[in-house]
Amino acid sequence: YDVHHAQEDTPQDKLGTHSPENPERKVEEREKGGYLKMEKNITGEKMLSHIDRIAGEKKPITADIFLTNYCNNRCPYCTYGRWELDAGAQAMRYEDFIIYAKRLAAMGVQGFILTGGGEPTINPDFEKIAGWLTENNFRWGMNTNFNKLVKVKPNYLKVSLDAYNNESYEQLRGVAAYEKVRENIKAYAAWKKENSPGTSLGIQQLVKEPEDVKRFY
């Protein structure tokens, strides 16, 4: 199960229907405690905001981009941890990303999600890539384990915390980084208040047993 806890909008809304500049939307979501009503997700509203993609030529709206196949976690169920940067891992260069992003934008892509098998923040050019997306007014989001604190300005930033204490984190993630990730989340939340208030910061949990949800909270 994948449980996502959002402070403001969901990632899909950030990159699809709603703009972070919409003040009425922000007030509405704050009044709801930061959660969308369930029917909102099944009415087709997000798709209807892209009616040209339904009635016209079928084109992608968002693009997920893997910046690297290297990860600094060692999850026992994942293959990406076996790659090392100096022994077969690959990372997309800044120059190549720009080429691909411009081509995708020309096709009609409106938003980008920096994600992966690998951990996107490990890419040596990550901050340059993130800066370029922001400077060129692209809507973009990122999924990260947040072992590394980065001060960037996406529309949404989703952290895979996944555990509820040091022991459970190390069991799931293969590294002892639970407290470090928590501190990075706190530091980013404080930083974004002044520097990127429009960013929706969320946390997701990997649930093995229903009881884990109670422990997480």
Regions found by a protein language model. Give the residues of each.
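Acidic/polar hotspots within intrinsically disordered regions
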Residues: D2-H5
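Short Gly/Ser/Thr- and charged-rich N-terminal loops/segments
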Residues: Q12, G16
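Conserved alpha-helical substructure of the radical SAM core
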Residues: G34-Y156, E167, Q171-L172, E179, ...
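Conserved phosphate-donor/acceptor-positioning beta-strand/loop module used by diverse small-molecule
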Residues: V159-L161
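Short, Lys/Arg-enriched N-terminal segments with co-localized hydrophobic residues
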Residues: R25-K37
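Short, electropositive alpha-helical surface patch
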Residues: G131-L133, K208-Y217
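Conserved strand-turn element in the central/C-terminal portion of the radical SAM core barrel
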Residues: I185-V213
